[in-house]
Each structure stands twice: as C-alpha cells, then as structure tokens.
A protein has these predicted regions:
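Membrane-embedded beta-strand positions of outer-membrane beta-barrel proteins
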Residues: 22-26, 58-62, 100, 114-118, ...
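Gram-negative (and chloroplast) outer-membrane scaffold detector with strong preference
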Residues: 53-142, 155-159
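Predominantly the C-terminal beta-signal and adjacent terminal strand-loop region
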Residues: 164-227
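Short glycine/proline- and aromatic-enriched beta-strand/turn motifs that initiate or cap beta-hairpins
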Residues: 7-58, 220-227
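Residues that define the transmembrane beta-barrel architecture of outer-membrane proteins
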Residues: 16-20, 39-45, 56, 92-98, ...
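Transmembrane beta-strands of outer-membrane beta-barrel pores
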Residues: 26-32, 53-55, 62-68, 120-126, ...
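Outer-membrane beta-barrel translocator domains and adjoining extracellular loop/strand segments
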Residues: 33-39, 70-79, 127-136, 175-179, ...
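Extracellular loop and loop/strand-boundary signature of outer-membrane beta-barrel proteins
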Residues: 30-36, 46, 81-90, 145-153, ...
Length: 227
C-alpha cells in the first residue's frame, strides 16, 4: 500500500466506521471516605472488550482484586456484654467488578488519543464469617470458640467514570476475519486509565460509603475493517 494510503489509515480516513477490540491489564485501587475505615486498597487484574463507531467507544470490562479488611467485625454483631459474636474468617475478601461504559474520543494527535468514559459498575465483595460462641474451659474461664463458618457478600450498582489514554504501539494489515478479499487494520496500544467509582455498604454497622479511585495499565488491541 502506498505511503499516502498508510498515512490516511493513521488518521482514520480509510477505516470503516466501526472497530472491535479487547484490553487486558493490571492496576490498583484505593477506597476513600468511610469506606477506608473498613477496607484497604488492592491490586487489580482487568480484562474486557471494546467496540468503536467513529469516535464513540463502548467498553465492557471485568476487574478482580483482594482488598484487606481493617474492621474484623463490619456488621458489629455483639452479645449483651459487648463481645464479638462474628469475626471475619477471611482477611482478604474477593472483589469482583463488572463495568459498562461509553465514551467519546475528544483528542487524537499522532500516536496518542484521549477518551473520557462514563457508565455503571456492578461490584461484589465476598468473604467468610466466623460465628463465635463462648464456652468455659477447664479453669472456668470463658473463651471464644468458632461455632460455625458461613459465606456472605455485599453487592450493588454504582456510577463510574474513567479516562482512556491510548498510546499507539504499532499497526499492521491483516486478513479480514469474516473472509472475502478485504483487509483489516490491527492496532495495538498501551492504555492508561485512571478511574473513579462510587460504592456503599448499607448493611455494615455503621454503614460506609465513598469512592474507589484507581489506575489500570492495559494492552489494548483494535481491529478495523478498511474500506
């Protein structure tokens, strides 16, 4: 293909109006507000799919992490004397998040593009609880004993926002995956995405809420059909 045509590909003039792709990466998040009273931040592993129509971007991704508890009895279950009747059996609960976002590429220059995104995030925090009872030992002193272990979770939907900063790594022509004589252009990028999402746990005692702020760094691939 002629150099002029390759330059036209870089500015999008030879592409069809749509593209599909994926991203996979790592990152981290920190809770703010009263969320930080009960939870610490954690590393995140992320992956997902993208669809683009001209400058519009639609993104669905999944994030996995294991934050740490600061509060060993977040439901604050006590007996009449103030002793714990529940304690976390899991120091690091499992955090699963599923995000759906839409955005628009507001700036594209050379190898760099910037796309603000907004959407919703469903998250689930799950862990095990020890149920405690108190029994007298041989010295007639009451000691805590684990009576039962059960699983529990907190989940919900919340607003989220992010900004995708894509730095193009390379591009190449490939065969069109749906067959025929057409070709497609595959572009790989380094994607840096700061994000914020709201979260609250009404069942905790006291209830906690705040935002989780974080950053992910991903490899992103995008396939566009050529006119």
């Amino acid at each position: 293909m002629a150099p002029a045509a390759l330059r036209a590909q870089d500015d999008g003039s030879l592409y069809n109006g749509w593209g599909v792709g994926f991203q996979v990466g790592v990152g981290g998040m920190l809770p703010t507000g009263s969320l930080s009273d009960d939870l610490k931040g954690c590393a995140l592993f992320t992956g997902g799919l993208n669809a683009e129509v001209n400058r519009l971007r639609f993104k669905a991704d999944v994030a996995y992490g294991q934050p740490s508890f600061k509060n060993n009895n977040p439901y604050h279950v006590l007996d009449d004397t103030g002793r714990d009747l529940q304690l976390n059996a899991t120091a690091n609960p499992t955090l699963l998040g599923v995000g759906l976002q839409a955005g628009y590429t507001v700036w594209r220059q050379g190898k760099v593009s910037v796309t603000p995104m907004v959407g919703v995030n469903w998250s689930r925090l799950s862990w095990d609880l020890n149920h405690i009872k108190y029994e007298k030992d041989d010295e007639d002193k009451e000691r805590p004993v684990i009576d039962d272990v059960t699983g529990t979770h907190e989940s919900g939907f919340a607003f989220m926002a992010s900004v995708d900063v894509d730095i193009k790594l390379h591009g190449k022509l490939v065969d069109y995956p749906l067959g025929g004589d057409r070709q497609a252009h595959y572009t790989s990028s380094l994607r840096i995405s700061p994000f914020v999402t709201h979260a609250k746990f009404d069942n905790f005692n006291p209830s906690v809420k705040g935002c989780c702020i974080g950053l992910t760094v991903s490899y992103a691939g995008l396939l566009r059909a050529i006119r």
